[in-house]
């Protein structure tokens, strides 16, 4: 049977710290391995025909972590952007970031905007990185913008236009590390997304694990609130 490949996959990339701890390493090593895992996953998703990949990289709640860890994550993201620029252009990957801009170092913000502009016409796959992102924050920001615009009688379609991007809703949400929660991620957008939870830690999430997730997705009966015809 031919596989039905999700158009949009979202991932809560969890478990970097636990991966490092199991090996007696600092959490920063786990984050570095997590970046390698993202590179590998993006390449495979591109190969199999996924059109949008949204990954949860840094939440609005992550500012409560130690200053050293937050600084490491900022530097790692900056390094990722610089190192992946050539690859994104070569493989026609569109780069996008969803989240608030406040508190992000200016140098990092500039590199984000630069890469977004450089890749805006790439059409193979869109990599959407949720950075300084929280879904409640996104919803509040949307509501405030609607109020500023003086809009009334808002529909779901109208509201969606005020979110951080206009990408289609995720078909499949994957969470690694076995945690059974959404963690303030894409609350509006995942209303009818299929959920897949794996105990595999993010640095170990490879092509075989992706295949398992898609196989599980293919076994689902997506009714979107309706009733299947008999």
Each language-model region and where it sits:
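Flexible, compositionally biased loop and terminal segments
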Residues: 1-230
